[in-house]
């Protein structure tokens, strides 16, 4: 069958070549022309791409379209095509050698840019003539040479006699030609680069043409000799020459001798390249200086392997091995004198290097096209011997050499069939050197130090070793031991693929046999690292369970002291096997049981260790972190969970959590979050698979079992982790972010798998957890904000809770958000005075918390309840969701507007209840700001927000349900005990906060007083108390009206354009002033009288004065004018008097106000007799403003004069009458008449 197949292939190839002969032309070696075949590795004119090699092997006409004319021109002379070689062979070869000489002569000419074009043309012409001649020889042999019958005694024609001698003549001439041209290695060095002229044509120096002509000659001589043998089917003897053994020269001996010489030349050229290359770059460097030399290697491979297959001759590898063995033995005396002497500084390295490069040439087929599927002849026998020499213990083996050798060996494993013997030879070496680090002093140490950092990195190393394609930088990145592991992996995988488990059993037996108790006890730390690398790789490529079991048995041989010192490494190795089990979806039960028990013991040690024992704690923590990281990888890697996964989550975690400090807790909680995320992801996948249609009972049963396993693992997490989180809600031990994240993950787990939650959380585990971490007022706001952000992000959870009807999910969430905003300047709630103290408000809040608050605000504003409030209030909110404080202000305002728009009593009542639910215990939220430590930013936030709340929700606070909260807000913020102590100064930050927000409170309280469902005397009293306290506290030090513009009480009146009850607020202010600031204690005037008079004056300037206010305040003003002589007081009192009189004129027509007249009448009665001079002076001022007021008082004034004179009993009081007359003089005719009556009165 094989012969039939070969014959079929032969016929197909022959037919293909016969059909494609129109392009045939003499091929030659060329690297000067770009590939024209599109993706070809050799030039289109090459022997490979032109099909010349294939024609030679298939015994076809070398050039079917050439030399078909009767005559041809060679070396400038016309010859008869069919007879030239017979009649003139010696002449033609002489002309050939003459052309060679001419080309060699051109080398002596200087090759500058001006002459290069001429020299290139001459040299190229000579080369083309020479190549054409040799191709003619080939064609002549194929077409015209006749095989003579040597036994025939019939007389022959002289031409036939000459023709019979032609083969021998050719042998002689070819041998002479080879002697003439000598060795390739003896040619002068050639620069492969070319000149490029203006037409982009490459121009080469004569030396380049000479080299390539020599290549052509060497190859074409082999072709001619091969064709001669194929044509004649007999040995052809030369007449003139004998070989080195004194035997007659034949076509076969000349062919073999020339092959040997040519291979020696190619080896010598390669050696020149190798000596210039570093070991680290040897496989990345090109072996051939020129593409044509590479082509010559490929041609020799095909030709020699073809001869060995069909004739009794040696294969290409045998030829090369024979020469390399001579090189390795360093015995030049064995070589013939005609052979070039080859010496190398590193014969072993060179042998590896050239075999590896030459092996890569086998991928090219007869057309020069790479064929990865082509069957490649291996050379393992020689490589095995070479490998034994490379690791011989007789000499010192350098790691840098060994890396290069093994890198070559690994590359050969890619090319050739697997060879178990190679692994065996290498293992014999490495088994004895396991304790070596295999490092190179001048290279950075990248091997085991990085590999053993973690179990995952150990597996990554194994994965890298098992890759089909290795890194070109393997020499620098990996030790020779790692490269050995790559070889081991590649050989075992390829062998098992082709031969089943038998090769693995061979390798396993060899490796296992080297490990026993004594050997295990001899291992150092490095040895143990190499041990784990080896067995992990074996597990990866073969039977993981068998290997893991054997490793556990071997580890039991280690000494206890060594186990203690190297426990971290042993744990890493153990965990690496556990990870491999998970990656291969195997049950981890056997490994998990033992490992988890060891973890529990170490967690217990960690719990009882003292904080002072830092070294011991660090040692134990290293082990625990290996376990934690590894178990996380196991869960993330596992395709599905088995009951054995639950074993990994034992009560060791409960002990560990109690012993951890913050940095350690971060690690454990990160692990928890990763495992929770994995469990939820796997549960969702199971649910999707269960919901598919047409799930058969077997699959359904399997999925149900998987779900039970998941539930068991989830229950373990609840049991060992959640109780700790619950206990740490109010402590600062657990980082806020991780506490919130972990709690949120448990919340989502409870949503997905509610039955796994503890019994005390049933039947609503999600609600129970949210109450603990989201709605509990004692939890730190940083935790609440982050936790609720996670919850609100899950739309499924929000939708379910919003429609559950179990609790007011949205309202309680809004309440927590309000608390988070109000407490943004509080670090934690463990102490009432633990605040963030910072001068800059923006910097006072941690950036991370502010980001979280912004995120929570954005999510909260997407709740349907919140959207509804803003929609009903027609308030825009999207633009301010990035600023939590502004967002809270807008929310308070929106609630107030929404309530104002509600029509029915039932809806109003429900809205009040909901609003109060939003606030919760709002005073508790702000209480930390009101402690002993005074914090400006916190106070500003508190008073500002509460002021907006009081004003915006005034109508809500007017209801009986909400009034109690209003009373508490006022008492807590505006009328605390410290404020009531007049002699005690309030802290400046507190006063500043009150000053900014007081107008809001006053306006809101005023609205409440006006709209209260039940008139409340206490509320009015509160309003009066607030006004009374803060009028005085914010009076300026100097009594100037201009300084009173920003008084908060006046601002409350000024900013109430949209509030109807302004008059009631002003009325209350006036009453407070009358009662508390213009009240004399005996004859002593009230304190800060000038400032209060300035305040009253500013009040009248900014508002419309009512007669009722005049009636209340004017007596006090008049009293100041009478009793106080201080100039400022008199000036301010006079100005107030003027404003009041003018104000009373507005609205009264010709008649003065009766109330105003009444006030002045009482004033005259009270002070007219004793302070008549002051009274008359005051009334003079009034008369200048409004004569009618004083005219209406004439009778009272006259009566007061008479009563005074009568009281004193001294007759007329001349001084008083003069003063009175002066007043009357300002009253026009009525005054004159009264003066006359007084003169006429003799009483």
Curated annotation (Swiss-Prot):
Coiled coil: none
PTM entry text: Degraded by the ubiquitin-proteasome system upon replication stress.
Biological processes annotated in GO: chromatin organization; double-strand break repair via homologous recombination; protein localization to chromatin; replication fork processing
Any one GO CC term of the record: site of DNA damage
Gene Ontology molecular function, alphabetical: single-stranded DNA binding
Protein keywords: Chromatin regulator, Chromosome, DNA damage, DNA repair, DNA-binding, Nucleus
InterPro entries attached to this UniProt entry: MMS22-like (IPR042320), MMS22L_C (IPR029424), MMS22L_N (IPR029425)
Subcellular location: Nucleus; Chromosome
Similarity field: Belongs to the MMS22 family. MMS22L subfamily.
Complex formation: Component of the MMS22L-TONSL complex, a complex at least composed of MMS22L and TONSL/NFKBIL2. Interacts with RAD51; interaction is direct.
Function of the molecule: Component of the MMS22L-TONSL complex, a complex that promotes homologous recombination-mediated repair of double-strand breaks (DSBs) at stalled or collapsed replication forks. The MMS22L-TONSL complex is required to maintain genome integrity during DNA replication. It mediates the assembly of RAD51 filaments on single-stranded DNA (ssDNA): the MMS22L-TONSL complex is recruited to DSBs following histone replacement by histone chaperones and eviction of the replication protein A complex (RPA/RP-A) from DSBs.
Name this polypeptide is given: Protein MMS22-like
């Amino acid at each position: 069958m094989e012969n039939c197949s070969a014959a079929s292939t032969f016929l197909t190839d022959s037919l293909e070549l016969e059909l494609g002969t129109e392009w045939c032309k003499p091929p030659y070696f060329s690297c000067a022309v770009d590939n024209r075949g599109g993706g070809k590795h050799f030039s289109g004119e090459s022997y490979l791409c032109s099909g010349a090699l294939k024609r030679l092997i298939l015994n076809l006409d070398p050039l079917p379209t050439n030399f078909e004319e009767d005559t041809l021109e060679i070396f400038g002379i016309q010859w008869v095509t069919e007879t030239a070689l017979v009649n003139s062979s010696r002449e033609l070869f002489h002309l050939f050698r003459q052309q060679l000489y001419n080309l060699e002569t051109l080398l002596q000419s200087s090759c500058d840019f001006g002459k290069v074009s001429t020299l290139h043309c001459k040299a190229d012409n000579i080369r083309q003539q020479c190549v054409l001649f040799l191709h003619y020889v080939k064609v002549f042999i194929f077409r015209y040479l006749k095989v003579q019958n040597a036994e025939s005694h019939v007389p022959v024609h002289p031409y036939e006699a000459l023709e019979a001698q032609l083969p021998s003549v050719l042998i002689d001439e070819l041998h002479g030609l080879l002697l003439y041209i000598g060795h390739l290695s003896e040619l002068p060095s050639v620069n492969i680069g070319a000149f490029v002229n203006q037409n982009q044509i490459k121009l080469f120096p004569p030396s380049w043409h000479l080299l390539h002509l020599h290549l052509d000659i060497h190859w074409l001589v082999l072709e001619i000799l091969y064709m001669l043998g194929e044509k004649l089917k007999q040995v052809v003897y030369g007449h003139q020459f004998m070989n080195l053994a004194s035997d007659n020269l034949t076509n076969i001996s000349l062919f073999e001798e020339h092959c040997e010489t040519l291979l020696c030349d190619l080896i010598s050229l390669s050696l020149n390249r190798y000596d210039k290359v570093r070991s680290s770059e040897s496989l990345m460097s090109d072996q051939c200086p020129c593409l044509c030399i590479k082509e010559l290697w490929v041609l020799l491979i095909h030709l020699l392997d073809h001869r060995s297959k069909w004739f009794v001759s040696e294969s290409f590898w045998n030829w090369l091995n024979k020469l390399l063995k001579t090189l390795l033995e360093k015995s030049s005396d064995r070589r013939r004198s005609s052979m070039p002497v080859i010496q190398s500084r590193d014969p072993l390295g060179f042998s590896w290097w050239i075999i590896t490069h030459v092996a890569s040439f086998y991928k090219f087929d007869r057309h020069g096209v790479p064929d990865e599927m082509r069957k490649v002849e291996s050379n393992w026998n020689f490589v095995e011997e070479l490998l034994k020499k490379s690791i011989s213990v007789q000499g010192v083996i350098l790691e840098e050499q060994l890396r290069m050798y093994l890198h070559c060996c690994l590359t050969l494993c890619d090319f050739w069939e697997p060879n178990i013997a190679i692994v065996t030879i290498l293992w014999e070496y490495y088994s004895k050197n396991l304790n070596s680090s295999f490092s190179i002093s001048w290279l950075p140490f990248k091997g085991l130090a990085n590999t053993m950092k973690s179990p995952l990195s150990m597996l990554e190393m194994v994965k890298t070793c098992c890759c089909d394609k290795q890194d070109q930088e393997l020499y620098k990145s990996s030790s020779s031991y790692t490269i050995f592991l790559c070889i081991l992996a590649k050989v075992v995988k390829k062998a098992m693929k082709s031969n089943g488990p038998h090769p693995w059993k061979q390798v396993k037996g060899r490796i296992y046999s080297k490990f026993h108790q004594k050997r295990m006890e001899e291992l150092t730390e490095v040895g143990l690292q190499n041990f784990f690398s080896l067995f992990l790789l074996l597990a990866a490529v073969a039977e993981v369970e068998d290997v893991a079991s054997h490793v556990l048995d071997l580890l039991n041989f280690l000494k206890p002291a060594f186990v203690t010192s190297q426990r971290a490494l042993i744990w890493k190795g153990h965990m690496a096997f556990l990870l491999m089990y998970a990656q291969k979806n195997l049950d981890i039960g056997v490994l998990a049981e033992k490992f988890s028990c060891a973890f529990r013991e170490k967690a217990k040690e960690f719990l009882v260790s003292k904080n002072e024992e830092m070294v011991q704690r660090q040692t134990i923590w290293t082990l625990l972190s290996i376990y934690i990281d590894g178990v996380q990888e196991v869960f993330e890697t596992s395709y599905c969970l088995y009951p054995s996964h639950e074993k990994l989550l034992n009560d060791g975690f409960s002990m560990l959590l109690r012993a951890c400090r913050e940095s350690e807790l971060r690690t454990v909680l990160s692990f928890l979050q990763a495992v929770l995320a994995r469990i939820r992801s796997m549960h969702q996948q199971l649910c999707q698979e269960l919901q598919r249609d047409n799930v058969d009972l077997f699959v359904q049963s399997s999925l149900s079992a998987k779900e039970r396993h998941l539930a068991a693992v989830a229950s373990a997490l609840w049991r060992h982790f959640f109780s700790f989180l619950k206990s740490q809600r109010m402590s600062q031990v657990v980082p806020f972010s991780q506490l919130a994240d972990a709690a949120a993950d448990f919340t989502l787990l409870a949503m997905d798998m509610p039955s796994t939650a503890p019994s005390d959380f049933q039947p609503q585990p999600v609600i129970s957890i949210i109450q603990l971490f989201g709605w509990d007022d004692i939890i730190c706001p940083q935790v609440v904000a982050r936790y609720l952000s996670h919850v609100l992000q899950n739309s499924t959870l929000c939708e379910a809770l919003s429609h559950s009807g179990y609790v007011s999910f949205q309202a309680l969430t809004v309440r927590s958000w309000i608390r988070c905003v109000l407490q943004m300047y509080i670090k934690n709630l463990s102490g009432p005075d633990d605040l963030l103290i910072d001068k800059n408000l923006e910097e006072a809040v941690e950036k991370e918390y502010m980001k979280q608050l912004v995120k929570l605000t954005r999510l909260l504003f997407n709740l349907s309840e919140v959207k509804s409030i803003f929609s009903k209030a027609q308030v825009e909110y999207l633009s301010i969701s990035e600023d939590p404080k502004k967002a809270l202000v807008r929310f308070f305002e929106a609630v107030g507007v929404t309530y104002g728009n509600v029509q029915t009593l039932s809806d109003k009542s429900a809205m009040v209840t909901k609003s109060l639910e939003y606030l919760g215990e709002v005073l508790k939220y702000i209480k930390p700001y009101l402690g002993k430590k005074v914090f400006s930013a916190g106070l500003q936030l508190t008073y500002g927000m509460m002021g907006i709340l009081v004003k915006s929700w005034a109508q809500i606070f007017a209801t009986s349900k909400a009034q109690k909260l209003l009373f508490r807000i006022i008492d807590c913020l505006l009328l605390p005990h410290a404020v009531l102590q007049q002699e005690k100064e309030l802290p400046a930050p507190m006063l500043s906060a009150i000053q900014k927000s007081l107008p809001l409170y006053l306006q809101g309280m005023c609205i409440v007083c006006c709209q209260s469902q039940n008139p409340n005397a206490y509320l009015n009293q509160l309003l009066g108390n607030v006004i009374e306290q803060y009028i005085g506290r914010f009076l300026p030090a100097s009594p100037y009206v201009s300084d009173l513009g920003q008084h908060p009480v006046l601002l409350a009146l000024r900013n109430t354009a949209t509030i109807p009850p302004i008059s009631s607020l002003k009325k209350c202010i006036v009453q407070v002033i009358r009662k508390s600031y213009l009240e004399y204690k005996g004859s002593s005037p009230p304190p800060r009288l000038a400032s209060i008079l300035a305040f009253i004056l500013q009040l009248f300037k900014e508002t419309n004065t009512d007669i009722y206010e005049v009636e209340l305040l004017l007596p006090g003003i008049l009293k100041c004018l009478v009793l106080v002589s201080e100039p400022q007081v008199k000036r301010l009192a006079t100005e107030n008097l003027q404003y009041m009189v003018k104000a009373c004129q507005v609205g009264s027509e010709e008649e003065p106000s009766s109330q105003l007249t009444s006030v002045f009448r009482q004033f005259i009665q009270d002070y007219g007799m004793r302070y008549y001079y002051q009274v008359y002076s005051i009334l003079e001022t009034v008369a200048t403003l409004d004569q009618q007021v004083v005219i209406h008082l004439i009778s009272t004034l006259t009566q007061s004069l008479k009563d005074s004179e009568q009281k004193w009993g001294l007759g007329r009081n001349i001084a008083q009458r003069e003063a009175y007359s002066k007043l009357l003089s300002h009253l026009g005719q009525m005054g004159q008449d009264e003066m006359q009556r007084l003169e006429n009165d003799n009483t």
